[in-house]
């Protein structure tokens, strides 16, 4: 039946499990491990209940009276093990997304572009930007204090003199390194020199061709970035392309042209290039749209994404919800340091409060503060999320857009409240869980 199971094995399930009947499916949610499986009939539910009661595998098998029931049991076990929903003799191991172990560095405000939608409003170097030596020390202290991941952006990171040294240092001390770049300043020699020190790199292309990209990023840039994308990918660096369309360059055939871009780039690379579409326009240099307009924008972008890959939503959802990986927060508490050393606990730094400067306190101080903020605004400590069985799968949403404190905590009275959740949104989330599960797993073949 299953090479890893013996008849005297007992499966251990997390204690808090909720079942929801959605259309013809039964969604089984393990609340405390942010996990779920989908059952297709009442037979499977009955068999699951026996396993949860502590029946040995062999005892369940002995009670089975038909081929249909046996097939249902095999599919149930396959689902349980595919999602690590239970353990043999032990409970499943939980992991947590810990945003306070991640560091986002806006290393300079200088940029060679003046993009209309830039939420950092980058362009000119700040008067008091930190030095190379400052950043080397900050990274070392971050690692010693338990830091794991660092993302460099700007401005344009390559505009910072000595960026190569910082990049190498971050890699050499064991940090996972991500770089966000506009892709225009990378020479052949720089790419070959620095690629070994980068775990992941993301480039921005905000149009489907030279003409539409130029509307946002200026003329003559499109082909340069595409070439940089191809070179990094072919050197084995995990490479992605992030696209933020604006209403100025969205056209009737954008979906067709965007798919052509995706196909053209992937044909030239030996490794997969990941394409990401921004589904929200943040307040930027020349962009500030209402929430209603953003909903329309999001719907349009999701349509483009679906045209390129009809299963993209399912794939992204499953990829973002690994079994037993608990998301208690949107990421608030993760540290962002601006070029002048100002510290924030969200990467949308111009919409939240600063908590001081890295030149005034050690990194460990800010990491502890970030952990504190991460916990006090987690779904365990906000209303009504703390009572919701979907809380660790949903994470509560954006602490700026979806909460009463709008990302600003200093003068806000507890309890913090999520203000955008509805029964309809919960139902959509559960339907998405089912559809993604059905797309990704097939236990009947």
Put a short name on every predicted segment.
Residues 248-250, 269-295, 313-326, 350-354:
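Flexible glycine/acidic-rich beta-alpha junction loops that bind and position SAM and/or redox cofactors
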Residues 96-133:
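Canonical Radical SAM [4Fe-4S] cluster-binding loop centered on the CxxxCxxC motif
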Residues 1-50:
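Acidic, low-complexity/disordered tracts enriched in E/D and polar residues
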Residues 236, 292-323, 348-390, 394-395, ...:
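C-terminal accessory region of radical SAM enzymes
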Residues 110-120, 345-348, 382-402:
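Local cysteine-cluster metal-coordination motifs and their immediate loop/turn environment
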Residues 328-332:
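Short, small/polar residue-rich loop motifs at catalytic or cofactor-binding pockets
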Residues 103-104, 120, 132-153, 160-279:
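Radical SAM/AdoMet-radical enzyme domain recognition
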Residues 39-106:
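Long, charge-rich, low-complexity alpha-helical segments
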């Amino acid at each position: 039946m299953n090479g890893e199971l013996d008849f005297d094995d007992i499966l251990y399930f997390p204690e808090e499990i909720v079942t929801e009947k959605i259309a013809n499916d039964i969604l089984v949610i393990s609340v405390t491990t942010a996990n779920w499986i989908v059952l297709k009939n009442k037979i499977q539910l009955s068999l699951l209940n026996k396993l949860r009661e502590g029946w040995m595998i062999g005892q369940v098998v002995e009670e089975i009276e038909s081929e249909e029931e046996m097939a249902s049991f095999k599919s149930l076990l396959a689902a349980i093990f595919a999602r690590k929903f239970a353990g043999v003799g032990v409970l499943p191991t939980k992991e947590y997304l810990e945003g306070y172990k991640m560091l986002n560095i806006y290393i300079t405000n200088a940029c060679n572009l003046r993009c209309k939608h830039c939420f950092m409003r980058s362009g000119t170097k700040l008067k008091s930007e930190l030095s190379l030596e400052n950043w080397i020390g900050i990274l070392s202290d971050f690692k010693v204090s338990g830091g794991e991941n660092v993302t460099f952006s700007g401005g344009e990171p390559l505009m910072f003199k000595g960026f190569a040294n910082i990049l190498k240092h971050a890699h050499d001390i064991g940090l996972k390194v991500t770089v966000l770049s506009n892709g225009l300043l990378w020479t052949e020699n720089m790419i070959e020199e620095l690629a070994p020190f980068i775990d992941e790199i993301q480039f921005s292309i905000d149009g489907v061709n030279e003409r539409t990209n130029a509307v946002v990023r200026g003329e003559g840039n499109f082909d340069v970035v595409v070439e940089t994308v191809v070179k990094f990918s072919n050197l084995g660096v995990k490479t992605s392309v992030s696209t933020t369309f604006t209403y100025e360059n969205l056209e009737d055939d954008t979906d067709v042209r965007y798919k052509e871009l995706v196909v053209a780039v992937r044909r030239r690379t030996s490794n997969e290039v990941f394409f990401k579409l921004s589904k929200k326009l943040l307040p930027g240099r020349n962009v500030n749209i209402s929430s209603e307009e953003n909903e329309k924008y999001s719907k349009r972008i999701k349509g483009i994404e679906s045209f390129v890959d009809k299963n993209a939503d399912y794939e992204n959802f499953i990829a973002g919800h690994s079994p037993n990986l608990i998301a208690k927060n949107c990421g608030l508490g993760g540290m962002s340091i601006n070029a002048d050393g100002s510290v924030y606990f969200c990467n949308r730094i111009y919409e939240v409060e600063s908590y001081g400067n890295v030149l005034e306190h050690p990194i460990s101080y800010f990491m502890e503060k970030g952990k504190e903020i991460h916990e006090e605004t987690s779904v365990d400590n906000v209303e009504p999320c703390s009572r919701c069985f979907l809380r660790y799968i949903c994470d509560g949403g954006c602490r700026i857009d979806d909460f009463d404190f709008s990302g600003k905590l200093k003068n806000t009275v507890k309890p913090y409240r999520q203000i955008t959740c509805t029964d309809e949104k919960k139902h959509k989330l559960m339907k998405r869980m089912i559809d993604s599960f059905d797309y990704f797993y097939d236990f009947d073949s």
